Amino acid sequence: MRTLVESNNVSFAYQNSTEPALQDISLRIRPGECVLFCGRSGCGKTTFSRLLNGLAPMFYPGELTGSCTVSGLLAGSAAIEQYVPLVGSVFQNPKTQYFNVDTTAELAFPCENSGMPPTAIRQRVQEVVAQFHLEALMDRSVFKISGGEKQRVAFAAACMLGPKLLVLDEPTSNLDAGAIRQLHDMIAAMKQVGMTIVLAEHRLAWVQDVVDRYFFFEAGQLTAVWTAADFAALPETTLQNAGLRARDLTACREKLRQKTTMQCTGVPILEVQNLTLGYHRRSLIRALPDMSFAAGEIVGLMGHNGIGKSTLAKTLCGLMEPLGGQILWEGKTANARTRLHKSFLVMQDVNYQLFSDSVREEILLGAAHPKLVDTVMQALGLNGLADRHPMSLSGGQKQRVVVAAAMLSDKPLILLDEPTSGLDRGNMEQVRRLLQQLKTQGKTIVVITHDEELAADWCDRIIALQD
């Protein structure tokens, strides 16, 4: 039987790391298959995907043993440029793979790098735009399109050279339901024309109908392989024990419907009145409805990509001033300095918040109760990472480091912007338990998210922002 990807006894340890990221991985992926790598945060999914697109060990140096080939290219021997026409990659954060500030130029870029004639480039751009229905996104600034739109353009750019393999690393972590459906349709279209697709993903419900096999990673090892039918038949307890997310969101969506309301039932501690958001007067983003937040509640803030959720979060915590309206804290107008003093924001991209040389030092920065650092690290599964450099961690581990810092800050207002990107089911439960503790201490917690599973499970009520 033909294989496109073949791995034999692969082990890999990142440079300066004492623990292997992968241990003795052997697998085969056939042409035209769609497979999904699943497992807990830090289990090795992303590392193995980096072997498939040539980023490891060339860009991410480390010690590689065994063999991993993609269409005959041997990881560790083949140069990165040899992978370019064969493997297309889509990352969790599309901003990290953009080379141009214009969407049309971004699509043309792979073809230009490959020496394609200008007329052929224009024709190929037109073909891909038509294939993925991107006409409305062409000739746009990449700074003025939503996260979901950026991901669609990144996906199309990855397909420009007609690769044999597409590798997608948590592509839905920052996408709303509509953008996820669009990405799903793009993946299904590529599978239909025979492209091989590898997904490394925590969120499982959106892609079940296109996945052929599931590869379960655990602590750097491949411990299970399921066909789609076998995976669908797994008991829910098996998924929970494995740290895997839900396969069906029907119950979550009903809970969300019941929890959606603008106003709190308790005494409001934070109030938003007649608020207008924007980066400057010529770039009006949103006129918001009035809303209020009480002490001791967890509120989910939901809405489609680009509606202004992250901008509202930055405004509430004092990083931005509104263009109009007012924000009240305990009934008094709260300026930016007051809001900064009262709040802690866990950003969507936590790399902006990591400054120290070790995980322990990072969590202790600004800690109001440093004696609790070991307790919080234990609760978030970070105790074994205390001396690691934060930038050497996986995306989910970095997220938990900043969440731990928020827990210890003792701020009365905690805002989390897409806190589940990179988090498995077990990590989600760990964070949920800590947020419940903060809730009992009277903290106000605002969670900005597209994650229906998280919102239904964590939040007391939901504020749904709409056009």
Predicted feature residues:
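Catalytic Walker B motif of ABC-type/P-loop ATPase nucleotide-binding domains
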Residues: 166-169, 414-417
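ABC-family nucleotide-binding domains
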Residues: 176, 424
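ABC ATPase C-loop
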Residues: 159, 406-407
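Helix-to-loop junction immediately C-terminal to a conserved catalytic motif
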Residues: 53, 317
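H-loop/switch region of ABC-family ATPase nucleotide-binding domains
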Residues: 201-202, 449-450
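Conserved ABC ATPase "signature" region
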Residues: 119-137, 370-385
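Conserved ABC transporter NBD signature motif
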Residues: 61-74, 325-339
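Conserved ABC ATPase signature
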Residues: 141-145, 149, 389-393, 397
